[in-house]
Protein backbone atom coordinates (compact mmCIF):
# COMPACT_ATOMS: atom_id res chain seq x y z
CA UNK A 1 0.00 0.00 0.00
CA UNK A 2 1.60 3.25 -1.18
CA UNK A 3 -0.97 5.58 0.37
CA UNK A 4 0.50 8.19 2.71
CA UNK A 5 -1.43 9.32 5.79
CA UNK A 6 -1.05 11.75 8.67
CA UNK A 7 -2.94 9.96 11.45
CA UNK A 8 -4.96 6.86 12.31
CA UNK A 9 -8.58 7.29 13.36
CA UNK A 10 -10.76 4.51 14.75
CA UNK A 11 -14.51 4.81 14.32
CA UNK A 12 -17.63 2.88 13.36
CA UNK A 13 -17.78 1.25 9.94
CA UNK A 14 -20.99 0.94 7.97
CA UNK A 15 -22.03 -2.45 6.50
CA UNK A 16 -21.31 -1.14 3.00
CA UNK A 17 -17.84 -0.02 4.11
CA UNK A 18 -17.10 -3.48 5.56
CA UNK A 19 -18.23 -5.04 2.30
CA UNK A 20 -15.91 -2.69 0.37
CA UNK A 21 -12.97 -3.89 2.48
CA UNK A 22 -13.43 -7.52 1.51
CA UNK A 23 -15.22 -7.50 -1.85
CA UNK A 24 -13.18 -7.20 -5.03
CA UNK A 25 -13.76 -7.63 -8.73
CA UNK A 26 -11.10 -9.73 -10.43
CA UNK A 27 -9.79 -8.81 -13.92
CA UNK A 28 -12.13 -11.44 -15.41
CA UNK A 29 -15.15 -9.71 -13.84
CA UNK A 30 -15.73 -12.25 -11.05
CA UNK A 31 -16.64 -10.78 -7.65
CA UNK A 32 -14.90 -12.47 -4.70
CA UNK A 33 -14.49 -11.79 -1.00
CA UNK A 34 -17.11 -13.78 0.89
CA UNK A 35 -15.90 -16.59 3.16
CA UNK A 36 -18.41 -19.44 3.32
CA UNK A 37 -16.39 -22.46 4.51
CA UNK A 38 -14.75 -22.98 7.92
CA UNK A 39 -11.88 -25.08 6.49
CA UNK A 40 -8.35 -23.68 6.39
CA UNK A 41 -6.09 -26.03 4.38
CA UNK A 42 -6.57 -29.40 2.69
CA UNK A 43 -4.97 -32.12 4.80
CA UNK A 44 -3.75 -34.05 1.71
CA UNK A 45 -2.47 -31.28 -0.56
CA UNK A 46 -1.68 -28.81 2.27
CA UNK A 47 -3.12 -26.08 0.05
CA UNK A 48 -5.80 -23.58 1.15
CA UNK A 49 -9.40 -24.64 0.68
CA UNK A 50 -11.40 -22.56 -1.77
CA UNK A 51 -13.86 -20.13 -0.10
CA UNK A 52 -12.23 -21.05 3.22
CA UNK A 53 -10.34 -18.95 5.74
CA UNK A 54 -7.13 -19.07 3.65
CA UNK A 55 -8.76 -19.02 0.19
CA UNK A 56 -6.31 -17.98 -2.52
CA UNK A 57 -9.11 -16.71 -4.73
CA UNK A 58 -10.15 -14.20 -2.06
CA UNK A 59 -6.85 -13.28 -0.42
CA UNK A 60 -4.30 -13.92 -3.17
CA UNK A 61 -1.79 -16.71 -3.95
CA UNK A 62 0.36 -18.32 -1.26
CA UNK A 63 3.40 -18.37 -3.57
CA UNK A 64 4.51 -15.37 -5.62
CA UNK A 65 3.08 -15.30 -9.16
CA UNK A 66 1.65 -18.83 -8.91
CA UNK A 67 -1.99 -19.92 -9.02
CA UNK A 68 -3.66 -22.57 -6.85
CA UNK A 69 -3.60 -25.36 -9.42
CA UNK A 70 -0.08 -24.59 -10.70
CA UNK A 71 -1.08 -23.86 -14.29
CA UNK A 72 0.45 -20.37 -14.22
CA UNK A 73 3.86 -19.63 -12.71
CA UNK A 74 6.38 -16.80 -13.01
CA UNK A 75 5.88 -13.03 -13.12
CA UNK A 76 5.26 -12.95 -16.88
CA UNK A 77 1.65 -14.04 -16.20
CA UNK A 78 1.04 -11.05 -13.91
CA UNK A 79 -2.61 -9.96 -13.78
CA UNK A 80 -4.01 -13.13 -15.37
CA UNK A 81 -6.84 -15.00 -13.63
CA UNK A 82 -6.49 -18.78 -13.89
CA UNK A 83 -9.38 -20.37 -15.80
CA UNK A 84 -9.29 -23.52 -13.67
CA UNK A 85 -8.92 -22.27 -10.09
CA UNK A 86 -9.86 -18.60 -10.48
CA UNK A 87 -6.78 -17.29 -8.64
CA UNK A 88 -5.26 -14.00 -9.78
CA UNK A 89 -1.51 -14.15 -10.59
CA UNK A 90 -0.06 -11.55 -8.24
CA UNK A 91 2.55 -11.04 -5.51
CA UNK A 92 1.82 -13.06 -2.35
CA UNK A 93 2.33 -9.93 -0.20
CA UNK A 94 -1.30 -9.02 -0.89
CA UNK A 95 -2.24 -11.71 1.65
CA UNK A 96 -1.08 -9.27 4.35
CA UNK A 97 -3.70 -6.63 3.55
CA UNK A 98 -6.49 -8.22 1.51
CA UNK A 99 -9.54 -8.81 3.68
CA UNK A 100 -12.64 -10.96 3.33
CA UNK A 101 -16.10 -10.87 4.88
CA UNK A 102 -18.75 -13.19 6.30
CA UNK A 103 -22.38 -12.52 5.40
CA UNK A 104 -24.20 -13.19 8.67
CA UNK A 105 -27.51 -15.05 8.52
CA UNK A 106 -28.77 -12.96 11.44
CA UNK A 107 -27.82 -9.59 12.88
CA UNK A 108 -25.56 -9.58 15.95
CA UNK A 109 -24.58 -6.79 18.32
CA UNK A 110 -21.03 -5.55 18.73
CA UNK A 111 -19.97 -6.60 22.24
CA UNK A 112 -17.95 -3.40 22.80
CA UNK A 113 -21.12 -1.30 22.56
CA UNK A 114 -23.14 -3.67 24.74
CA UNK A 115 -20.68 -4.50 27.53
CA UNK A 116 -18.39 -1.48 27.26
CA UNK A 117 -18.28 1.25 29.87
CA UNK A 118 -20.40 3.17 29.23
CA UNK A 119 -22.68 0.94 27.16
CA UNK A 120 -23.39 3.09 24.09
CA UNK A 121 -26.44 1.11 22.95
CA UNK A 122 -27.98 1.12 26.43
CA UNK A 123 -27.47 4.88 26.79
CA UNK A 124 -28.97 5.70 23.39
CA UNK A 125 -32.01 3.51 24.04
CA UNK A 126 -32.36 4.74 27.62
CA UNK A 127 -32.33 1.28 29.18
CA UNK A 128 -30.05 -0.51 31.63
CA UNK A 129 -27.26 -2.82 30.54
CA UNK A 130 -29.01 -5.73 32.25
CA UNK A 131 -32.20 -5.13 30.25
CA UNK A 132 -30.18 -4.81 27.05
CA UNK A 133 -28.43 -8.13 27.69
CA UNK A 134 -31.76 -9.83 28.35
CA UNK A 135 -32.88 -8.82 24.84
CA UNK A 136 -29.58 -9.49 23.04
CA UNK A 137 -29.11 -12.98 24.48
CA UNK A 138 -32.73 -14.09 23.90
CA UNK A 139 -33.96 -14.06 27.50
CA UNK A 140 -36.62 -11.36 27.11
CA UNK A 141 -38.75 -9.94 24.32
CA UNK A 142 -39.14 -6.23 23.69
CA UNK A 143 -42.03 -4.25 22.23
CA UNK A 144 -40.84 -2.38 19.14
CA UNK A 145 -44.25 -0.97 18.22
CA UNK A 146 -46.62 0.00 21.03
CA UNK A 147 -50.35 -0.69 21.33
CA UNK A 148 -52.06 1.45 23.95
CA UNK A 149 -55.26 -0.61 23.86
CA UNK A 150 -53.37 -3.64 25.17
CA UNK A 151 -51.18 -1.70 27.62
CA UNK A 152 -48.02 -2.60 25.70
CA UNK A 153 -45.67 0.37 25.87
CA UNK A 154 -42.69 1.05 23.64
CA UNK A 155 -39.51 -0.79 24.74
CA UNK A 156 -41.49 -2.80 27.28
CA UNK A 157 -39.79 -6.09 28.17
CA UNK A 158 -41.86 -9.27 28.02
CA UNK A 159 -41.12 -12.69 29.41
CA UNK A 160 -41.47 -15.95 27.49
CA UNK A 161 -44.93 -16.58 28.96
CA UNK A 162 -46.15 -13.08 28.01
CA UNK A 163 -44.93 -13.52 24.44
CA UNK A 164 -46.59 -16.94 24.10
CA UNK A 165 -49.88 -15.52 25.32
CA UNK A 166 -49.76 -12.87 22.61
CA UNK A 167 -48.40 -15.17 19.90
CA UNK A 168 -51.15 -17.79 20.34
CA UNK A 169 -53.95 -15.21 20.45
CA UNK A 170 -55.98 -14.91 17.24
CA UNK A 171 -57.06 -11.34 17.90
CA UNK A 172 -55.96 -9.22 14.93
CA UNK A 173 -55.28 -6.17 17.08
CA UNK A 174 -52.72 -8.15 19.06
CA UNK A 175 -50.92 -9.26 15.91
CA UNK A 176 -50.37 -5.63 14.94
CA UNK A 177 -47.91 -5.24 17.80
CA UNK A 178 -44.39 -5.93 16.71
CA UNK A 179 -42.62 -7.85 19.44
CA UNK A 180 -39.07 -8.92 18.73
CA UNK A 181 -35.98 -10.37 20.39
CA UNK A 182 -32.22 -10.45 19.88
CA UNK A 183 -29.98 -8.10 17.93
CA UNK A 184 -32.67 -7.60 15.28
CA UNK A 185 -34.93 -6.07 17.94
CA UNK A 186 -32.12 -3.74 19.07
CA UNK A 187 -31.52 -2.72 15.46
CA UNK A 188 -35.20 -1.85 15.05
CA UNK A 189 -35.15 0.23 18.24
CA UNK A 190 -32.01 2.07 17.12
CA UNK A 191 -33.63 2.83 13.75
CA UNK A 192 -36.55 4.45 15.56
CA UNK A 193 -34.32 6.77 17.61
CA UNK A 194 -34.37 10.41 16.48
CA UNK A 195 -31.07 11.72 17.81
CA UNK A 196 -31.89 15.42 17.44
CA UNK A 197 -35.27 15.06 19.15
CA UNK A 198 -33.81 12.91 21.94
CA UNK A 199 -31.08 15.49 22.58
CA UNK A 200 -33.59 18.36 22.80
CA UNK A 201 -35.86 16.36 25.15
CA UNK A 202 -32.93 15.60 27.47
CA UNK A 203 -31.94 19.29 27.55
CA UNK A 204 -35.49 20.20 28.58
CA UNK A 205 -35.50 17.59 31.36
CA UNK A 206 -32.07 18.42 32.80
CA UNK A 207 -33.02 21.52 34.87
CA UNK A 208 -35.77 19.59 36.69
CA UNK A 209 -34.00 16.25 37.21
CA UNK A 210 -32.54 15.16 40.51
CA UNK A 211 -28.81 14.69 40.86
CA UNK A 212 -28.69 10.92 40.20
CA UNK A 213 -30.97 11.14 37.17
CA UNK A 214 -29.27 14.28 35.88
CA UNK A 215 -25.91 12.48 35.78
CA UNK A 216 -27.52 9.64 33.85
CA UNK A 217 -29.15 12.11 31.44
CA UNK A 218 -25.84 13.92 30.93
CA UNK A 219 -24.10 10.65 30.05
CA UNK A 220 -26.85 9.82 27.57
CA UNK A 221 -26.76 13.32 26.07
CA UNK A 222 -22.98 13.12 25.67
CA UNK A 223 -23.22 9.87 23.66
CA UNK A 224 -26.07 11.21 21.51
CA UNK A 225 -24.10 14.38 20.76
CA UNK A 226 -21.12 12.26 19.73
CA UNK A 227 -23.25 10.41 17.19
CA UNK A 228 -24.75 13.68 15.93
CA UNK A 229 -21.32 15.30 15.53
CA UNK A 230 -19.75 12.27 13.81
CA UNK A 231 -22.85 11.67 11.62
CA UNK A 232 -22.66 7.93 12.31
CA UNK A 233 -25.77 5.80 12.19
CA UNK A 234 -26.40 4.07 15.56
CA UNK A 235 -27.53 0.94 13.69
CA UNK A 236 -23.90 0.44 12.63
CA UNK A 237 -23.33 -0.94 16.13
CA UNK A 238 -25.32 -3.96 14.92
CA UNK A 239 -23.30 -6.22 12.62
CA UNK A 240 -24.77 -7.78 9.48
CA UNK A 241 -21.40 -8.36 7.82
CA UNK A 242 -18.30 -9.51 9.69
CA UNK A 243 -14.85 -8.55 8.33
CA UNK A 244 -12.20 -11.29 8.09
CA UNK A 245 -8.57 -10.39 8.75
CA UNK A 246 -5.92 -11.06 6.06
CA UNK A 247 -4.56 -14.61 6.42
CA UNK A 248 -0.93 -13.58 6.93
CA UNK A 249 -2.00 -11.71 10.09
CA UNK A 250 -3.44 -14.97 11.52
CA UNK A 251 -1.00 -17.51 10.05
CA UNK A 252 -0.92 -21.29 10.14
CA UNK A 253 2.63 -22.71 10.34
CA UNK A 254 3.69 -26.33 9.85
CA UNK A 255 5.93 -27.70 12.61
CA UNK A 256 8.70 -30.31 12.33
CA UNK A 257 6.51 -33.24 13.36
CA UNK A 258 3.96 -32.56 10.65
CA UNK A 259 1.56 -30.80 13.01
CA UNK A 260 0.34 -27.25 12.49
CA UNK A 261 0.47 -24.26 14.80
CA UNK A 262 -2.28 -21.77 14.07
CA UNK A 263 -3.47 -18.43 15.34
CA UNK A 264 -6.34 -18.46 17.83
CA UNK A 265 -8.29 -16.19 15.49
CA UNK A 266 -8.70 -19.05 13.01
CA UNK A 267 -10.48 -21.16 15.65
CA UNK A 268 -12.74 -18.25 16.56
CA UNK A 269 -13.56 -17.52 12.90
CA UNK A 270 -14.27 -21.23 12.37
CA UNK A 271 -16.81 -21.20 15.21
CA UNK A 272 -18.56 -18.19 13.69
CA UNK A 273 -18.71 -19.71 10.18
CA UNK A 274 -19.95 -23.09 11.44
CA UNK A 275 -22.75 -21.53 13.46
CA UNK A 276 -23.62 -19.06 10.71
CA UNK A 277 -23.89 -21.83 8.09
CA UNK A 278 -25.96 -23.96 10.45
CA UNK A 279 -28.33 -21.06 11.11
CA UNK A 280 -28.70 -20.40 7.38
CA UNK A 281 -29.62 -24.05 6.76
CA UNK A 282 -32.17 -24.03 9.60
CA UNK A 283 -33.78 -20.90 8.16
CA UNK A 284 -33.94 -22.50 4.71
CA UNK A 285 -35.81 -25.56 5.99
CA UNK A 286 -38.04 -23.36 8.20
CA UNK A 287 -37.01 -25.00 11.46
CA UNK A 288 -38.98 -24.39 14.68
CA UNK A 289 -38.60 -20.91 16.15
CA UNK A 290 -37.08 -22.27 19.36
CA UNK A 291 -34.21 -23.94 17.47
CA UNK A 292 -33.56 -20.88 15.32
CA UNK A 293 -33.52 -18.61 18.37
CA UNK A 294 -31.03 -20.88 20.10
CA UNK A 295 -28.80 -20.89 17.01
CA UNK A 296 -28.97 -17.08 16.78
CA UNK A 297 -27.88 -16.86 20.42
CA UNK A 298 -24.95 -19.19 19.74
CA UNK A 299 -23.96 -17.07 16.72
CA UNK A 300 -24.07 -13.97 18.91
CA UNK A 301 -21.82 -15.64 21.49
CA UNK A 302 -19.38 -16.79 18.78
CA UNK A 303 -19.06 -13.24 17.40
CA UNK A 304 -18.63 -11.90 20.95
CA UNK A 305 -15.78 -14.36 21.53
CA UNK A 306 -14.14 -13.35 18.23
CA UNK A 307 -14.27 -9.64 19.02
CA UNK A 308 -13.52 -9.77 22.76
CA UNK A 309 -13.20 -13.23 24.29
CA UNK A 310 -14.28 -13.31 27.93
CA UNK A 311 -15.95 -9.88 27.89
CA UNK A 312 -19.39 -11.27 28.64
CA UNK A 313 -18.39 -14.04 31.01
CA UNK A 314 -16.71 -17.38 30.53
CA UNK A 315 -14.00 -17.27 27.86
CA UNK A 316 -13.73 -19.74 24.98
CA UNK A 317 -10.71 -21.99 25.61
CA UNK A 318 -8.52 -24.08 23.32
CA UNK A 319 -7.25 -27.63 23.60
CA UNK A 320 -5.00 -26.86 26.58
CA UNK A 321 -7.70 -24.93 28.48
CA UNK A 322 -6.05 -21.63 27.58
CA UNK A 323 -8.39 -18.75 26.65
CA UNK A 324 -8.20 -18.01 22.92
CA UNK A 325 -6.78 -14.61 21.96
CA UNK A 326 -9.48 -12.49 20.36
CA UNK A 327 -9.20 -9.35 18.23
CA UNK A 328 -9.32 -7.15 21.34
CA UNK A 329 -6.54 -9.14 23.02
CA UNK A 330 -4.35 -8.64 19.94
CA UNK A 331 -4.68 -4.85 19.86
CA UNK A 332 -4.94 -3.93 23.55
CA UNK A 333 -2.38 -3.79 26.33
CA UNK A 334 1.38 -3.48 26.46
CA UNK A 335 1.92 -6.43 24.12
CA UNK A 336 -0.85 -5.28 21.76
CA UNK A 337 -0.49 -4.17 18.18
CA UNK A 338 -0.50 -0.45 18.96
CA UNK A 339 1.91 -0.22 21.90
CA UNK A 340 4.17 -3.07 20.82
CA UNK A 341 4.37 -2.67 17.04
CA UNK A 342 3.12 0.79 16.06
CA UNK A 343 4.04 3.10 18.94
CA UNK A 344 7.05 1.18 20.28
CA UNK A 345 8.94 -0.20 17.33
CA UNK A 346 12.42 -1.68 17.63
CA UNK A 347 14.95 0.56 15.89
CA UNK A 348 18.42 -0.05 14.51
CA UNK A 349 21.52 1.29 16.30
CA UNK A 350 19.89 0.90 19.70
CA UNK A 351 20.35 -1.24 22.79
CA UNK A 352 19.02 -1.70 26.29
CA UNK A 353 20.57 -2.57 29.63
CA UNK A 354 20.32 -2.10 33.39
CA UNK A 355 21.73 1.13 34.86
CA UNK A 356 24.12 1.31 37.80
CA UNK A 357 25.69 4.28 39.54
CA UNK A 358 28.92 5.75 38.17
CA UNK A 359 30.08 8.43 40.64
CA UNK A 360 33.49 8.64 38.99
CA UNK A 361 31.94 9.92 35.76
CA UNK A 362 31.61 13.54 34.75
CA UNK A 363 28.15 15.00 34.35
CA UNK A 364 28.30 14.76 30.56
CA UNK A 365 29.57 11.16 30.53
CA UNK A 366 28.00 7.73 30.78
CA UNK A 367 29.59 4.31 30.96
CA UNK A 368 28.74 2.18 27.91
CA UNK A 369 29.48 -1.56 28.20
CA UNK A 370 32.19 -2.67 25.78
CA UNK A 371 30.07 -5.56 24.51
CA UNK A 372 27.24 -3.18 23.64
CA UNK A 373 29.51 -0.47 22.22
CA UNK A 374 31.28 -2.78 19.73
CA UNK A 375 27.88 -3.92 18.44
CA UNK A 376 26.29 -0.47 18.19
CA UNK A 377 29.30 1.23 16.62
CA UNK A 378 30.19 -1.73 14.39
CA UNK A 379 29.30 0.02 11.09
CA UNK A 380 31.46 2.99 12.08
CA UNK A 381 34.34 0.70 13.05
CA UNK A 382 34.07 -1.21 9.76
CA UNK A 383 34.07 2.06 7.80
CA UNK A 384 37.15 3.32 9.67
CA UNK A 385 39.02 0.03 9.11
CA UNK A 386 38.34 0.15 5.38
CA UNK A 387 39.00 3.92 5.15
CA UNK A 388 42.42 3.61 6.78
CA UNK A 389 43.34 0.70 4.50
CA UNK A 390 43.64 -1.84 7.31
CA UNK A 391 41.21 -4.22 5.53
CA UNK A 392 39.86 -4.49 2.01
CA UNK A 393 36.26 -5.55 2.56
CA UNK A 394 33.48 -5.79 5.13
CA UNK A 395 34.00 -9.50 5.74
CA UNK A 396 37.62 -8.97 6.78
CA UNK A 397 36.62 -6.06 9.02
CA UNK A 398 33.97 -8.18 10.76
CA UNK A 399 36.56 -10.91 11.28
CA UNK A 400 38.84 -8.47 13.11
CA UNK A 401 35.93 -7.29 15.28
CA UNK A 402 34.87 -10.84 16.17
CA UNK A 403 38.40 -11.70 17.29
CA UNK A 404 38.25 -8.87 19.87
CA UNK A 405 41.78 -7.87 19.03
CA UNK A 406 43.44 -4.67 20.30
CA UNK A 407 43.10 -3.08 16.85
CA UNK A 408 39.29 -3.29 17.00
CA UNK A 409 39.16 -1.70 20.46
CA UNK A 410 41.57 1.05 19.42
CA UNK A 411 39.45 1.90 16.38
CA UNK A 412 36.30 1.76 18.54
CA UNK A 413 37.77 4.24 21.02
CA UNK A 414 38.64 6.61 18.17
CA UNK A 415 35.17 6.30 16.65
CA UNK A 416 33.40 6.90 19.98
CA UNK A 417 35.47 9.99 20.76
CA UNK A 418 33.25 13.00 20.18
CA UNK A 419 30.26 10.89 19.11
CA UNK A 420 27.41 11.49 21.61
CA UNK A 421 24.83 8.83 22.40
CA UNK A 422 21.23 9.21 23.57
CA UNK A 423 19.91 7.61 26.74
CA UNK A 424 16.17 7.21 27.17
CA UNK A 425 14.23 5.89 30.14
CA UNK A 426 10.61 4.90 29.64
CA UNK A 427 8.16 6.38 30.26
CA UNK A 428 9.42 9.56 28.57
CA UNK A 429 7.04 11.98 30.29
CA UNK A 430 8.96 15.18 29.48
CA UNK A 431 11.83 16.21 27.23
CA UNK A 432 14.44 15.48 29.89
CA UNK A 433 13.48 11.79 29.69
CA UNK A 434 15.95 11.48 26.80
CA UNK A 435 19.37 13.17 27.00
CA UNK A 436 22.74 12.83 25.33
CA UNK A 437 26.05 11.81 26.90
CA UNK A 438 29.62 11.19 25.85
CA UNK A 439 30.21 7.42 26.04
CA UNK A 440 33.04 5.94 28.08
CA UNK A 441 33.93 2.26 27.61
CA UNK A 442 33.39 0.25 30.79
CA UNK A 443 33.55 -3.43 31.65
CA UNK A 444 30.51 -5.50 32.52
CA UNK A 445 27.07 -5.37 30.96
CA UNK A 446 25.46 -2.46 32.83
CA UNK A 447 25.21 1.17 31.74
CA UNK A 448 26.83 3.53 34.23
CA UNK A 449 25.05 6.78 34.92
CA UNK A 450 26.02 9.87 36.90
CA UNK A 451 23.76 10.04 39.98
CA UNK A 452 22.98 13.74 39.51
CA UNK A 453 21.04 13.15 36.26
CA UNK A 454 18.72 10.57 37.84
CA UNK A 455 15.95 13.05 38.88
CA UNK A 456 15.53 14.15 35.26
CA UNK A 457 14.97 10.55 34.18
CA UNK A 458 13.06 9.68 37.38
CA UNK A 459 15.50 6.78 37.61
CA UNK A 460 17.02 4.90 40.48
CA UNK A 461 19.43 1.99 40.71
CA UNK A 462 17.11 -0.78 41.84
CA UNK A 463 16.99 -2.54 38.48
CA UNK A 464 15.83 0.23 36.14
CA UNK A 465 16.65 -0.19 32.47
CA UNK A 466 17.53 2.45 29.90
CA UNK A 467 17.69 2.42 26.13
CA UNK A 468 20.73 3.58 24.14
CA UNK A 469 20.37 5.21 20.72
CA UNK A 470 23.15 6.28 18.34
CA UNK A 471 22.54 9.52 16.38
CA UNK A 472 23.76 8.87 12.85
CA UNK A 473 23.61 12.07 10.79
CA UNK A 474 25.76 15.11 11.48
CA UNK A 475 22.61 17.14 12.17
CA UNK A 476 21.47 14.63 14.80
CA UNK A 477 24.92 14.55 16.40
CA UNK A 478 25.17 18.34 16.57
CA UNK A 479 21.66 18.58 18.03
CA UNK A 480 22.53 15.95 20.62
CA UNK A 481 25.71 17.81 21.57
CA UNK A 482 24.30 21.35 21.64
CA UNK A 483 20.75 20.86 22.91
CA UNK A 484 20.47 17.48 24.59
CA UNK A 485 23.73 17.19 26.52
CA UNK A 486 23.03 16.60 30.22
CA UNK A 487 24.94 19.68 31.57
CA UNK A 488 22.82 21.90 29.28
CA UNK A 489 19.59 20.63 30.87
CA UNK A 490 19.94 21.57 34.52
CA UNK A 491 16.56 23.34 34.84
CA UNK A 492 13.19 21.60 34.94
CA UNK A 493 11.06 22.60 31.91
CA UNK A 494 7.94 22.39 34.08
CA UNK A 495 8.89 24.56 37.06
CA UNK A 496 12.16 26.25 36.13
CA UNK A 497 13.81 24.91 39.28
CA UNK A 498 17.19 23.21 39.23
CA UNK A 499 16.82 19.52 38.48
CA UNK A 500 20.50 18.57 38.83
CA UNK A 501 20.35 18.66 42.62
CA UNK A 502 22.11 16.24 44.98
CA UNK A 503 19.87 13.99 47.02
CA UNK A 504 19.87 10.87 49.17
CA UNK A 505 23.34 9.29 49.23
CA UNK A 506 25.03 12.43 47.86
CA UNK A 507 23.62 14.66 50.61
CA UNK A 508 24.46 12.07 53.24
CA UNK A 509 28.00 11.74 51.86
CA UNK A 510 28.56 15.52 51.91
CA UNK A 511 27.30 15.67 55.48
CA UNK A 512 29.53 12.78 56.54
CA UNK A 513 32.64 14.31 54.92
CA UNK A 514 32.16 17.67 56.62
CA UNK A 515 30.77 16.51 59.98
CA UNK A 516 32.46 17.48 63.24
CA UNK A 517 33.52 14.65 65.50
CA UNK A 518 34.17 15.99 69.04
CA UNK A 519 36.24 12.95 69.95
CA UNK A 520 38.74 13.90 67.25
CA UNK A 521 39.38 17.35 68.75
CA UNK A 522 41.55 15.93 71.52
CA UNK A 523 44.60 15.62 69.32
CA UNK A 524 45.30 18.85 67.42
CA UNK A 525 49.01 18.50 66.81
CA UNK A 526 48.95 17.13 63.24
CA UNK A 527 50.61 19.56 60.82
CA UNK A 528 50.97 19.02 57.06
CA UNK A 529 52.82 20.98 54.43
CA UNK A 530 49.96 20.80 51.89
CA UNK A 531 46.62 19.10 51.15
CA UNK A 532 48.26 16.23 49.25
CA UNK A 533 50.30 15.22 52.29
CA UNK A 534 47.16 15.22 54.41
CA UNK A 535 45.28 13.00 51.95
CA UNK A 536 48.28 10.66 51.73
CA UNK A 537 48.34 10.33 55.52
CA UNK A 538 44.60 9.54 55.49
CA UNK A 539 45.04 6.90 52.79
CA UNK A 540 47.79 5.30 54.88
CA UNK A 541 45.41 5.20 57.89
CA UNK A 542 47.59 7.55 59.95
CA UNK A 543 44.68 9.90 60.54
CA UNK A 544 40.89 9.50 60.49
CA UNK A 545 38.47 11.13 58.06
CA UNK A 546 37.27 13.48 60.83
CA UNK A 547 40.64 14.14 62.50
CA UNK A 548 41.31 17.86 62.93
CA UNK A 549 44.61 18.78 61.27
CA UNK A 550 46.57 21.92 60.46
CA UNK A 551 47.54 22.33 56.82
CA UNK A 552 49.86 24.97 55.42
CA UNK A 553 48.17 26.93 52.64
CA UNK A 554 50.13 30.01 51.70
CA UNK A 555 48.32 30.36 48.36
CA UNK A 556 44.90 30.72 50.02
CA UNK A 557 43.67 34.14 51.06
CA UNK A 558 42.68 33.74 54.71
CA UNK A 559 40.73 36.53 56.37
CA UNK A 560 41.63 37.09 60.02
CA UNK A 561 38.61 37.88 62.19
CA UNK A 562 38.30 39.68 65.52
CA UNK A 563 38.87 36.51 67.52
CA UNK A 564 42.43 36.21 66.24
CA UNK A 565 45.17 37.33 68.62
CA UNK A 566 48.73 38.24 67.84
CA UNK A 567 51.83 37.55 69.90
CA UNK A 568 55.49 38.22 69.22
CA UNK A 569 58.24 35.76 69.98
CA UNK A 570 61.61 37.19 69.11
CA UNK A 571 61.45 38.38 65.51
CA UNK A 572 58.33 36.24 64.75
CA UNK A 573 54.79 37.59 64.79
CA UNK A 574 52.35 34.77 65.62
CA UNK A 575 48.62 34.99 64.85
CA UNK A 576 46.24 32.57 66.62
CA UNK A 577 42.57 31.90 65.83
CA UNK A 578 40.04 29.11 66.15
CA UNK A 579 40.74 27.77 62.66
CA UNK A 580 43.60 29.96 61.45
CA UNK A 581 47.28 30.21 62.39
CA UNK A 582 50.03 32.22 60.79
CA UNK A 583 53.58 33.29 61.50
CA UNK A 584 55.54 36.09 59.92
CA UNK A 585 59.08 37.33 60.38
CA UNK A 586 59.27 40.98 61.33
CA UNK A 587 62.06 41.46 58.84
CA UNK A 588 60.31 39.67 55.93
CA UNK A 589 56.98 40.08 54.16
CA UNK A 590 56.36 36.34 53.65
CA UNK A 591 53.71 34.88 55.92
CA UNK A 592 53.28 31.16 56.62
CA UNK A 593 49.56 30.36 56.99
CA UNK A 594 47.84 27.31 58.47
CA UNK A 595 44.18 26.35 58.39
CA UNK A 596 42.41 23.85 60.61
CA UNK A 597 40.36 21.33 58.66
CA UNK A 598 39.74 17.59 58.27
CA UNK A 599 40.67 15.12 55.51
CA UNK A 600 36.94 14.80 54.70
CA UNK A 601 36.61 18.52 54.00
CA UNK A 602 39.76 18.45 51.86
CA UNK A 603 38.28 15.63 49.77
CA UNK A 604 34.99 17.52 49.30
CA UNK A 605 36.89 20.66 48.31
CA UNK A 606 38.85 18.71 45.68
CA UNK A 607 35.60 17.30 44.27
CA UNK A 608 34.09 20.77 43.90
CA UNK A 609 37.22 22.08 42.24
From Swiss-Prot:
Binds 1 Mg(2+) ion per subunit. InterPro entries: DNA-dir_RpoC1_gamma, DNA-dir_RpoC_beta_prime, RNA_pol_asu, RNA_pol_N, RNA_pol_Rpb1_1, RNA_pol_Rpb1_3, RNA_pol_Rpb1_3_sf, RNA_pol_Rpb1_clamp_domain. Zn(2+) binds at residues 67, 69, 82, 85. Gene3D superfamilies: 1.10.40.90, 2.40.40.20, RNA polymerase II, clamp domain, RNA polymerase Rpb1, domain 3. The keyword Protein biosynthesis does not apply. Signal peptide: none annotated. It is found in: Plastid, Chloroplast. It catalyses: RNA(n) + a ribonucleoside 5'-triphosphate = RNA(n+1) + diphosphate. Its EC number is 2.7.7.6. In plastids the minimal PEP RNA polymerase catalytic core is composed of four subunits: alpha, beta, beta', and beta''. When a (nuclear-encoded) sigma factor is associated with the core the holoenzyme is formed, which can initiate transcription. This is DNA-directed RNA polymerase subunit beta'. The gene is rpoC1.
Amino acid sequence: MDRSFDYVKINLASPSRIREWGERKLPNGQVVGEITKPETINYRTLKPEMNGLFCERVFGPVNDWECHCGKYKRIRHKGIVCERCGVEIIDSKVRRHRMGFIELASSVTHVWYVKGRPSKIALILGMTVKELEQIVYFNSYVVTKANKDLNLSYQQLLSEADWLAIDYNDDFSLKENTISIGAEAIKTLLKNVDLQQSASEIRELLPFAKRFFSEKLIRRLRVINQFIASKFDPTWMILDILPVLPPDLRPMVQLDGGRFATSDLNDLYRRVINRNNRLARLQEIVAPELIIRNEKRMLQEAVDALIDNGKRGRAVVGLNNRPLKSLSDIIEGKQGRFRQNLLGKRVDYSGRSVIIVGPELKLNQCGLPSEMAIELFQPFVIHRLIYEGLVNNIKAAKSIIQKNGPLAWEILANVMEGHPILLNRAPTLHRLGIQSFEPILVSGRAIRLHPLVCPAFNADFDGDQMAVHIPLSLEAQSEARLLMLAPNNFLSPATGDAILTPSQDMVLGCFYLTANNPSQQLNKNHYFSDFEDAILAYQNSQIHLHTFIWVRCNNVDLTEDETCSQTQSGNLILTHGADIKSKQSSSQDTKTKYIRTTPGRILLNEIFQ
